[in-house]
Amino acid sequence: MSEIQSLTERALADVAAAQTPDQLEALRVALLGKSGSITAQLKQLGTLPAEQRKAAGEAINLSRDALTAALSERKHTLETAALDARLAGERIDVTLPGRRSERGGLHPVTRTLERIVEIFARLGYELSDGPEIEDDWHNFEALNFPPHHPARAMHDTFYFGDGRLLRTHTSGVQVRYMDAHKPPLRMIAAGKVYRSDSDQTHSPMFHQVEGLLVDEHSNFADLKGTLSEFVRAFFERDFEMRFRPSYFPFVEPGAEVDIAWQQPDGSTRWLEVLGCGMVHPNVLRSVGIDPERYTGFAFGLGVERFAMLRYGVNDLRAFFENDVRFLRQFA
């Protein structure tokens, strides 16, 4: 009995002194494992006299239970201490400055496009859309560009092998709109167009807005009034404007619109901003509208051109280089 008590006291002291889980596991094996000290005492019960076995067995069981409880408690203590140490090392310093979320914004071309569409919406124009991959009929023939007409060369077209093409203007949307609606009608088409051209003021892909009005009594004076109001609303100031005769196959007469633009040095020069004209009778006929009864006017503008003027950008290519330093100015 005294031997078991002495063994238990030494073992409890060793358990309390264990500093790591590995040390504690080694003690458990040495005490309670198959070859452990307490297990050996149990195996020796059969060698004791019968009158001593009961008391010795009870003492050994009490010792085993005490050691098992001590091992479990010490294991929990060591695990808690290890967790506290790890958490202390991973503690977040709440006094550190936070990471600022970057503020985004619309691309300047998108902002300009939305501004143009909103102005024409106030004037009663409905926004319509169409495919960027067009057929020859909607992009050229219906707009008074017969096959082999030299005016087609002005468009620097991207063709596919099956005869389809990347639209060179949004005028094809006007043809589709007139096919689906009866006069009177008033619409604008906005989106990407493609031409094989690239320099400081041209891009192979750019954005265009075109407008169309067809009614029984529309005339060139209505066209001038509409565009004058648009230019004033877009730039938020009045400009001296002039309409120069020009050629576009789908209008007759056709004109280009210039505004008197003030230079940084204070001088003024004429700056082209729009193309326009009265819808050609052949275009109306191609969509089943009687040109003897209805007349109309059309106009078109490059969105990047207006964005360059509005934001003072000299090189159109800056809009497509994705330079965050440049784009952040407009966020």
From Swiss-Prot:
Its main location: cytoplasm. It catalyses: tRNA(Phe) + L-phenylalanine + ATP = L-phenylalanyl-tRNA(Phe) + AMP + diphosphate + H(+). The keyword Acyltransferase does not apply. InterPro entries: aa-tRNA-synth_II, aa-tRNA-synth_II/BPL/LPL, Phe-tRNA-synth_IIc_asu, Phe-tRNA_ligase_II_N, Phe_tRNA_ligase_alpha1_bac, Phenylalanyl-tRNA_Synthase, tRNA-bd_arm. Keywords: Aminoacyl-tRNA synthetase, ATP-binding, Cytoplasm, Ligase, Magnesium, Metal-binding, Nucleotide-binding, Protein biosynthesis. Its EC number is 6.1.1.20. The keyword Protein biosynthesis applies. Mg(2+) binds at E252. Binds 2 magnesium ions per tetramer. One of its GO terms (molecular function) is phenylalanine-tRNA ligase activity. It is an enzyme of class 6 (ligase). Its cofactor is Mg(2+). Gene3D superfamilies: Bira Bifunctional Protein, Domain 2. One of its GO terms (biological process) is phenylalanyl-tRNA aminoacylation. PANTHER family: PHENYLALANINE--TRNA LIGASE, MITOCHONDRIAL, PHENYLALANYL-TRNA SYNTHETASE. Tetramer of two alpha and two beta subunits. Belongs to the class-II aminoacyl-tRNA synthetase family. Phe-tRNA synthetase alpha subunit type 1 subfamily. This is Phenylalanine--tRNA ligase alpha subunit.
